[in-house]
């Protein structure tokens, strides 16, 4: 079931901005390989997103160090994976296939976490929860580095539970278990920086249990110290790059928290881990019904889970494993709030970041709801229904909705089209490419000329207008769509010239804004004397 839900309709949704960024670096390219400040036909996108052979992980890491804010291991793995698929066929599905595969593997690992922590039956319950979670399936269908770190965090929890049981149940230390725990956490740091939060939470949880139980065995503390030191030394080669990445402009897009908004946004995110019914782009009545139903289900599930947790904490056989998973999950959530209010960046507005603690959440949910009457079967049922909605693009819709933007661009398919994107950074370029890819899917069999262009607008938008006026002669009529982040509706000029021969007038009825504004201009030949 987990595999089916993750691979079903894998290429149905168009790539969005972040997935385009994944594609660029995973194909062995960088932003300097993109055709900027010139007009090119939409068909050139096939060449832009082609695999560049002969690259090493060192090359990819160098590209990421200079042009991105991510560690290299996921992208190196993706580059190797895509190399096995040469020549690329359905490249969007192939790009998303490996993250989906990591998502399936996480189902197996979370089974072992709860099997070792509790029992085989509880392990199967955790696997079932992970398999049908709309949140986990959503992450698995993204060509992004979320399922691989989630897999590694699940593995780290597996070894953490083993360590906890060795210390408090068997009074022993197995060096290989500690070594595996350290290795898995080290690898995770080279996959996603947020795995640092997971590592800190694991250390805090283990240290808290040791202090609570007044563990004075010197060998335990030495082993923990050596393990942490080994992780730190192993990550040191990339540490300075991480500090450089933390200061880049790409990390500044998150807004400051609005009072207690992060609190209720966190609760909403927990509900979305269990149930996601359509509310986006829906009639108000349908959205309201879905929202109320999700809220009622969420309240019921949380109430039953709390009752189950209380019983687990009272039972000596399950107390330590429950505390280990609960401590890890709670610690990460507290770290999130520390980041939000200390750095003034509200990360709760981005549900996908909850991948850091989702393995712990899923494991706790399964063990606390199992045996609580109809609650556990209900979680599985609403999860399956939610995943069906997800696979038909009714929930967890792609940011900036590239498929909707492409349909708006293509309202007059028989008229030649030019899409011009004003960019101030490479994220604007990636966003424009996502629109182009969605448009290419619509126009794959069309003979009507469709062109795309990216022009630098760092100084001001007038620079884009000037470059359009300097273009070579274009055929008329022409529909010109101008995409300009940060531009208000009234700031779009009434008329734009494309080359010296076409005059383009703004169509007041064709202004849209889906996270970013875009405006239609209708171009005709200028009158000549």
Mark where each language-model region is.
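Specific aromatic-rich, kink-prone transmembrane helix
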Residues: 80, 109, 132, 136, ...
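Membrane-interface helix-loop-helix junctions at transmembrane boundaries of multi-pass membrane enzymes
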Residues: 111, 115-116, 171-172, 210-225, ...
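Perimembrane helix-loop-helix junctions
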Residues: 159-176, 181, 185, 197-232, ...
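Catalytic lumenal/periplasmic loop and adjoining terminal transmembrane helix
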Residues: 371-516
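Short acidic/glycine- and proline-prone juxtamembrane loop motifs at membrane-interface regions
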Residues: 141-145
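Short helix- or helix-capping micro-motifs
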Residues: 126-131
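Transmembrane-helix motifs of polytopic, lipid-linked glycan transferases
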Residues: 97-117
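Hydrophobic/aromatic-rich transmembrane helices and adjacent perimembrane loops
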Residues: 323, 344-372
